[in-house]
């Protein structure tokens, strides 16, 4: 039996319509957005390097055909995708991993295995409206669940097979210079040795300008036979801009915490086909554009690239386009692809 993810069709949880639909075009693009009707595993290598990846795939709740029945199958479902993300990610890449609490817990070891460093867990609190009329408190054996997780990870790059803090320490050691001279190089009292060249838990990521000073001093005064120092390619020392690109971005908006009080998606933003669904939503897991915009603007700059591997109705990609970013997304259910693409003004069918 293949371990590859199957087609992502809604089954068993009130699917509103049959997902069968014919498409004239299975790839749509406009210079800012590219949408593929395909398994994302088949197109990752064609996409530009991501600055952010927004994952909203299997939850382990039989949400679609190919989803697992419970959280036990989550690691196997995601592993091939996570491995592909890691091959294309850089130190500047942020992953936003949407899931249930138990789904995220099951996936976390796989994310760590492939180099994703946990940053923070954000909770979407949908409020009591999410369960209104759907909970019998006389029989339920737990508190009603009204939350969903959106967990932030940063890709942890390696240089010379070492993580960044050990690589910095190793490179200075190679120079043959006393570590105390690193403080002189940076114009600091002791922060270079205490923080930037510390391979332990006190390590801090050096600002780009500080890194450039370290590299310049090392290459000017260090053992000539070991040059270049602080080089990623073995030819030239890294520049300040190259070093800055070894860390993911984050811009925290004022007043926002890791608990997002936001009612369930409803109204005009919820995609429906009244003649087919009788008023039901097309996609059970459609995310609000405002939450997608929040995470994209926090972790990318205009013009940077966002991936949406499990597109659904392409909410992350639409938010990315509206925020002036580039988006690459895949969805292999033709109906979802068609309905999502129409949100951009494309006509795929």
Question: What residue ranges belong to the model's regions?
Answer:
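Short intrinsically disordered terminal tails
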Residues: 1, 348-349
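Core catalytic lobe of class I
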Residues: 1-13, 21-329, 333-337
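Conserved SAM-binding loop
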Residues: 340-341
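Conserved phosphoryl-transfer catalytic core
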Residues: 336, 345-348
């Amino acid at each position: 039996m293949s371990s590859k993810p199957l087609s992502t069709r809604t089954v068993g949880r009130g699917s509103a319509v049959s997902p069968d639909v014919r498409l004239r075009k299975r790839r749509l693009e406009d210079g800012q957005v590219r949408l593929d009707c395909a398994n994302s595993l088949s197109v990752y290598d064609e996409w530009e390097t991501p600055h952010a990846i927004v994952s909203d795939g299997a939850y382990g709740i039989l949400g679609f055909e190919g989803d697992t029945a419970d959280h036990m199958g989550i690691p196997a479902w995601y592993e091939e995708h996570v491995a592909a993300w890691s091959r294309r990610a850089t130190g500047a890449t942020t992953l936003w991993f949407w899931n249930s609490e138990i789904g995220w817990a099951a996936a976390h070891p796989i994310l760590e295995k492939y180099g994703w460093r946990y940053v923070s867990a954000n909770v979407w609190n949908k409020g009591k409206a999410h369960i209104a009329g759907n909970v019998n408190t006389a029989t339920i054996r737990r508190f009603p669940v009204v939350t969903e997780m959106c967990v932030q990870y940063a890709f942890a790059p390696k240089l010379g097979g070492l993580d960044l803090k050990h690589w910095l320490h190793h490179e200075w050691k190679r120079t043959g210079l006393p570590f105390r001279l690193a403080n002189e190089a940076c114009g600091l009292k002791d922060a270079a040795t205490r923080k930037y060249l510390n391979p332990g838990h006190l390590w801090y990521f050096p600002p780009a300008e500080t890194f450039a000073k370290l590299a310049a001093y090392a290459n000017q005064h260090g053992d000539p036979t070991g040059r270049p120092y602080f080089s990623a390619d073995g030819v030239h020392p890294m520049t300040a801009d190259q070093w800055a690109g070894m860390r993911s971005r984050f811009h925290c908006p004022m007043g926002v915490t890791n608990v997002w009080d936001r009612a369930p998606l409803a109204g005009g933003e919820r995609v429906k086909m009244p003649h087919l669904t009788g008023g039901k939503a097309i996609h059970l897991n459609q995310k609000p554009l405002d939450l997608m915009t929040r995470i994209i603007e926090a972790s990318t700059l205009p013009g940077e690239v966002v991936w949406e591997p499990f597109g659904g109705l392409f909410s992350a990609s639409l938010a990315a386009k509206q925020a002036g970013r580039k988006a690459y997304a895949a969805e292999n259910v033709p109906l979802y692809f068609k309905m999502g693409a129409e949100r951009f003004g494309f006509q795929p069918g």
